[in-house]
Design a protein with these regions (language model features):
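Blade-loop segments of beta-propeller domains
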Residues: 76-117
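Asp-box/WD-like beta-propeller blade repeats and closely related beta-sheet repeat scaffolds
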Residues: 115-138
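Short coil turn/linker residues within repeat-based beta-strand modules
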Residues: 67, 75-80, 126-128
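Blade/loop signatures of beta-propeller domains
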Residues: 21-31
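Sec-dependent N-terminal signal peptides
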Residues: 4-13
Length: 138
């Protein structure tokens, strides 16, 4: 009987302690200037590709980190412009400028695909895959 009371007490405490998952917002908190459109799953670690001649054409690349996730391209107002091919748990994304490919020079977005253990490479600013399905790394 004692175990039943302990179980009931523990359940009650857990229920009440988890009822509000967000910390209260302070009155003097700084509000974001722009918020991107929401994605279905966990998102973080954005990268910004800066257009070489017109900064207003720069884009934000963010990850949707679930099994059916991908890279998302946003304009500077936070509107989704494009989604990459489906990636299996993409992780962080980074931008590199001036990669020599044959006679061309391109900018790239690079992410890891955790479920396939591959590096994925996309040409910028079109977010097109250029890695023939990924580069195995593990």
């Amino acid at each position: 009987m004692k175990k039943v009371y302990i179980l009931a007490l523990t359940s009650g405490l857990l229920t009440f302690s988890c009822s509000d998952k967000l910390a209260p917002l302070k009155k003097d908190a700084i509000a974001p200037t722009v918020v991107t459109q929401p994605l279905p799953h966990d998102t973080d670690d954005p990268a910004i590709w800066i257009h070489p001649t017109d900064a207003t054409k720069s884009v934000i690349i963010g990850t949707d980190k679930d099994t059916d996730g991908g890279l998302y391209m946003y304009d500077l107002k936070g509107t989704i412009l494009k989604k990459s091919i489906v990636l299996q748990r993409p992780n962080n994304v980074d931008i590199a400028y001036g990669l020599k490919v044959g006679e061309s020079t391109i900018d790239i977005a690079v992410t890891t695909e955790r479920e396939t253990n591959k590096i994925r490479v996309f040409a910028m600013p079109n977010l097109e895959p250029i890695d023939n399905g990924g580069i195995p790394v593990f």
